[in-house]
Amino acid sequence: MIQMQTNLDVADNSGARRVQCIKVLGGSHRRYASVGDIIVVSVKEAIPRGRVKKGDVRKAVVVRTAKEVKREDGTSIRFDRNAAVILNNQGEPVGTRIFGPVVRELRAKNFMKIISLAPEVL
């Protein structure tokens, strides 16, 4: 469950290390985002010579949350930390690699590029 002011790890090699959610997209008063939702983030920490810089405002998709995600078959999955992947204006990932596992729910939301780059899909 991601809301405004939530800090997230970045799970790709775009150059950002930590981002902060500044808006949850999808509705005028939408408060929370879960796995597969698109948020607007501000880059708080970045590596030198990366594709994104500190202070950049970008869109990102949430790929891991500490709050469990309940599935239709009754199982649930949760992670230790919240993580996101930075997107460009076309909705494609900025980075060329994804670090750590991602959840199967991204497939239903048509993030196939992230699914194919991820080392593990849970």
Curated annotation (Swiss-Prot):
GO biological processes: translation
Molecular function in Gene Ontology: large ribosomal subunit rRNA binding; structural constituent of ribosome
InterPro entries in alphabetical order: Ribosomal_uL14, Ribosomal_uL14_bac-type, Ribosomal_uL14_CS, Ribosomal_uL14_sf
Annotated SMART domains: Ribosomal_L14
Pfam families: Ribosomal_L14 (PF00238)
Keyword Transferase on entry: no
Keyword Ribonucleoprotein part of the UniProt annotation: yes
Cellular component GO terms held in the UniProt record: cytosolic large ribosomal subunit
Keywords from the UniProt entry: Ribonucleoprotein, Ribosomal protein, RNA-binding, rRNA-binding
Entry coiled-coil feature ranges: none
Subunit structure: Part of the 50S ribosomal subunit. Forms a cluster with proteins L3 and L19. In the 70S ribosome, L14 and L19 interact and together make contacts with the 16S rRNA in bridges B5 and B8.
Function: Binds to 23S rRNA. Forms part of two intersubunit bridges in the 70S ribosome.
Stated family: Belongs to the universal ribosomal protein uL14 family.
PANTHER family hit by this protein: 50S/60S RIBOSOMAL PROTEIN L14/L23, LARGE RIBOSOMAL SUBUNIT PROTEIN UL14M
Protein known as: Large ribosomal subunit protein uL14
Organism: Paracoccus denitrificans (strain Pd 1222)
